[in-house]
UniProtKB/Swiss-Prot annotation:
Role, per record: RuBisCO catalyzes two reactions: the carboxylation of D-ribulose 1,5-bisphosphate, the primary event in carbon dioxide fixation, as well as the oxidative fragmentation of the pentose substrate in the photorespiration process. Both reactions occur simultaneously and in competition at the same active site.
Chief location bin: plastid
Higher taxonomy: Eukaryota, Viridiplantae, Streptophyta, Embryophyta, Tracheophyta
Post-translational modification: The disulfide bond which can form in the large chain dimeric partners within the hexadecamer appears to be associated with oxidative stress and protein turnover.
EC number: 4.1.1.39
Keyword Chloroplast applies: yes
Additional notes on this entry: The basic functional RuBisCO is composed of a large chain homodimer in a 'head-to-tail' conformation. In form I RuBisCO this homodimer is arranged in a barrel-like tetramer with the small subunits forming a tetrameric 'cap' on each end of the 'barrel'.
Pfam families the UniProt entry points to: RuBisCO_large, RuBisCO_large_N
Record-given protein name: Ribulose bisphosphate carboxylase large chain
Co-factor binding comment: Binds 1 Mg(2+) ion per subunit.
Binding site for Mg(2+): 167, 169-170
GO cellular component: chloroplast
BP GO annotations: photorespiration; reductive pentose-phosphate cycle
InterPro entries tied to this protein: RuBisCO (IPR033966), RuBisCo_large_chain_AS (IPR020878), RuBisCO_lsu_C (IPR000685), RuBisCO_lsu_C_sf (IPR036376), RuBisCO_lsu_fd_N (IPR017443), RuBisCO_lsu_N_sf (IPR036422), RuBisCO_lsuI (IPR020888)
Length: 441
């Protein structure tokens, strides 16, 4: 069975048992009345069952309802069908004040019907020939308004300075000021020029998201013909069907696939209604993507440490044990499905590098947008500062130093021989985003 954990807030006067049963019925075989065609099938075989209800500590009117769904309710290899069944209709139920899907347990038999990520962590490292450290990346800013040539210039400067990747922002598609084909051409030129000068493999996440699947394929095919290593997709606004199709194309044609989670906070930000990001992360791993955003813990975007590391493990590891302290409601076995690199992004700069290296480990992508392009000396020095800070942190960690305790000292030591890093430390030394996370256990 597929198991689901729902946070249920019933209307006043509705018992939690009734609310849990209603969720199970509405998201499987039930409707609001008895129908004569019920007698033409075996409802016992197909109906969802609410098998356990528990109170939420500190919340008098909220309960966790556990629901089991028989596997035969779901089409094989279709995230679209799975989510349509489980969360498609029930969230508007009048008997509930609010409903949130906290977690899913996907059984190995169903996991095996999915291709998953086009390549996975190890294949990506082999393609890029980069091992033993997180990857570095920058989103080109301003995200909108640059011409294709100026955009390509910024890409070149960042890659030449030492970053592994640069990236289109999520809303860069094909606007009047910069059509997609022009952007692809100038970015490809920047990639190959920086590769020739540095001797390292470089990439730029070319956003293939489009208004139709046919147009999306056209852009992905052009990227492959240019010989670039990676494309990108906005998987929630683009849709799971389009995302799975693009993931299959990327595996067949040797392209890495970066996933942007634009719109996720609309779904997952509210604590008592919607869907937790760990569910979206599991769905993405099944649908297909080699990278996805996972918060930062230390930056400007939402993310509490234990919860964030919980779904980072769900993205990367083959087997994840149930751990309620990290928000993981079920043990998850991914069998042979490849892992996904977690991307840390949002309001981070060189002073955060020790914490990010310690929190996310090697199998991650650290994304410094303003933290690269905001350097007072320009884009390339900003990239140099980030690369020097990362190399210093990785070396210190490998020497057995504690990044959590000695992080500031490690960055200070490195800045003595890197004027670019020293300038970055000076300009961002006062920047803090000290807000409490909304999403807590």
């Amino acid at each position: 069975d597929i198991l689901a954990a729902f946070r249920v807030t019933p209307q006043p006067g509705v018992p939690p048992e009734e609310a849990g049963a209603a969720v199970a019925a509405e998201s499987s075989t039930g409707t609001w009345t008895t129908v004569w065609t019920d007698g033409l099938t075996s409802l016992d075989r197909y109906k969802g069952r609410c098998y356990h209800i528990e109170x939420v500590p500190g919340e008098e009117d909220q309960f966790i309802a556990y629901v089991a769904y028989p596997l035969d309710l779901f089409e094989e290899g279709s995230v679209t069908n799975m989510l349509t069944s489980i969360v498609g209709n029930v969230f508007g139920f009048k008997a509930l004040r609010a409903l949130r899907l906290e977690d899913l347990r996907i059984p190995p038999a169903y996991v095996k019907t999915f291709q998953g990520p086009p390549h996975g962590i190890q294949v990506e490292r082999d393609k890029l020939n980069k091992y033993g450290r997180p990857l570095l990346r920058c989103t080109i800013k301003p995200k909108l308004g640059l011409s294709a040539k100026n955009y390509g210039r910024a890409v070149y400067e960042c890659l030449r300075g030492g970053l592994d990747f640069t990236k289109d922002d999520e809303n860069v598609n094909s606007q009047p000021f910069m059509r997609w084909r022009d952007r692809f051409l100038f970015c490809a030129e920047a990639i190959f020029k920086s590769q020739a000068e540095t001797g390292e493999i470089k990439g730029h996440y070319l956003n293939a998201t489009a208004g139709t699947c046919e147009e999306m394929y056209k852009r992905a095919i052009f990227a492959r013909e240019l010989g670039v290593p990676i494309v990108m997709h906005d998987y929630l606004t683009g849709g799971f069907t389009a995302n799975t199709s693009l993931a299959h194309y990327c595996r067949d044609n040797g392209l890495l696939l970066h996933i942007h989670x634009x719109m996720h906070a609309v779904i997952d930000r509210q604590k008592n209604h919607g869907m937790h990001f760990r569910v979206l992360a599991k769905a993405l791993r099944m649908s297909g993507g080699d990278h996805i955003y996972a918060g930062t813990v230390v930056g400007k975007l939402e993310g509490e440490r234990d919860i964030t590391l919980g779904f980072v493990d769900l993205l990367r590891d083959d087997f994840v044990e149930k751990d309620r302290s990290r928000g993981i409601y079920f043990t998850q076995d991914w069998v042979s499905l490849p892992g996904v690199l977690a991307v840390a992004s949002g309001g981070i700069h060189v002073x955060h590098m020790p914490a990010l290296t310690e929190i996310f480990g090697d199998d991650s992508v650290l994304q410094f947008g303003g933290g690269t392009l905001g350097h007072p000396w320009g884009n390339a020095p900003g990239a140099v500062a980030n690369r020097v800070a990362l190399e210093a942190c990785v070396q210190a960690r490998n020497e057995g130093r504690d990044l959590a305790v000695e992080g500031n000292e490690i960055i200070r030591e490195a800045s003595k021989w890197s004027p670019e890093l020293a300038a970055a430390c000076e300009v961002w030394k006062e920047i803090r985003f000290n807000f409490k996370a909304v999403d807590t256990l």
